[in-house]
Amino acid sequence: MDLRKLAADAVSQNKKAALLIGGAGVAILGFGLGYKYLRKPEKAVRVGVVSQLLIHPLKSGKAVPLALAECQKMGLKFGELQDRHWMVVAEDGHMVTGRQEPRLVLVSLTCEGGQVCLNGPNMEELKFPIKQPDNPILDCRVFGVDIQGRDCGDKVSHWLTDYFKAEKTYRLVHFEPSMRPRKTAEKEAVYQQFEEVAYPDFGAVMLLSEASVKDLSSKLEKGVTVERFRPNIVISDCKPFDEDSWEELQIGSVRLQRVMACGSYRLCTPSEKHIYKTAPLFGQLHNVKKTGIFQVGDVVYKITR
């Protein structure tokens, strides 16, 4: 056996392998550098200022104004309050909103020291624990999509039924972290499969400008306020309907991506049907690309490339 020949062959094979590995490495490095330099850099353009942050813990309930909020994938959060994580349901589990019970918009739900505080006009405040692990989990429906909720108890049910002066029984449910969220793509195909919410109609975050509301209000017989449209983020220092063209936004440490316009059924009162034949689109729904913190007074930047 010629050991020198075997050694020479081994060296030759190692050189070929090294060349192949080195070539692959150069190719990968070249692709990475090419992507880096071919990709257009981001530009941040100032488009407005956050004038209000509003969280709606109870679906169709009264807004709670915030000075600062955490923006999670499923919407705004502040302490024990999370946006649209409580919901009124009928006995069959179907959601009850301001469409069915207009007085629901006057009900306030807040949290303090592990307790939920429920308030409404001409009603005594009702307090009950946020966590009630012994209560049953109810199967509920939001726009035909199944979702669960922890029943908040009989006392709360009696309070709601008395408030609405209803012959039917209403119950309050709470969405808990261990429960499976709704996939918004099941209702709106423009959403990605990974985008999820608890009890909102569709998107995690709704954004609207003061200028758009003022412009619209001037065209209506009875003026409207921002609160009527139930946004989470209200923007000032911009022109009417500028927000309709903001595809990607940076606010504080939060990055938002526009998904679709919001169908504002709230406008369709009998006196306004001469203006709108169907429910108009008003405000913009966003998903959360990057979670973080924002606050009133933060500058809003439009991201372009």
Set out the residue ranges of the language-model regions.
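Metal-cofactor-dependent catalytic cores
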Residues: 2-305
